[in-house]
Amino acid sequence: ALGKFPIMCNGANLVFSRRIWDKAQNRLVDTEASGDDIFLLHYIKEIKGRVVYFKDIDGFVETLAADTLHAFYNQRKRWTSKSRSYTDVQTVFVALLVTLTSITMAASMIAAIFDSKFILLWLIKLVIDSALLIPFLLFSHQKYLIGYIPFLSVIYPFYIIMTVFGGL
């Protein structure tokens, strides 16, 4: 809900009224293995309900990460597969933007092997990503992760491409 643009949520850290949940039941997508949280968010947006981000470190809920890289990948594929049922225009737009940007970044990194000018595109993206990530990492007391941003920015486009095509 930051910037009045809610596109993601996590059921472990989501608060809503019983009335909204009851009203949304016929709108949640039964054909998907998971995703009630996202589909509930889409419903609330559709009915012009109020969505806010509670920016308080004490409000964070920690959940267990996947045990293995394989389990992590399967979880992401499952999340990606439910995107076929998304009807929220903002969410679909951002998903397409992330996918197309990832394809562009992967192609530019490969092209940089032959022409170093393509590194400039990666550097621009790194600066933009850092400007978005660093304030959150500082706020959430995860400053130690800042040093991983350059390394992960190289891997991330390929991870997104694999996940998108694995989940479709």
Question: How would you label these PLM feature ranges?
Answer:
Residues 9-10, 79, 159:
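Tryptophan-centric aromatic hotspots in well-structured domains and transmembrane helices
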Residues 6-20, 38:
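Short glycine- and hydrophobic/aromatic-rich loop-to-beta-strand nucleating segment
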Residues 1, 19-22, 27-91:
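Catalytic donor/gating beta->alpha subdomain of glycosyltransferases that bind UDP-sugars
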Residues 94-168:
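Membrane-embedded multi-pass helical conduit in multi-pass membrane proteins
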Residues 5, 9, 31-33, 62-65, ...:
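Alpha-helix initiation/capping motif
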Residues 1-6, 164-168:
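Low-complexity, charge- and small-residue-enriched intrinsically disordered regions
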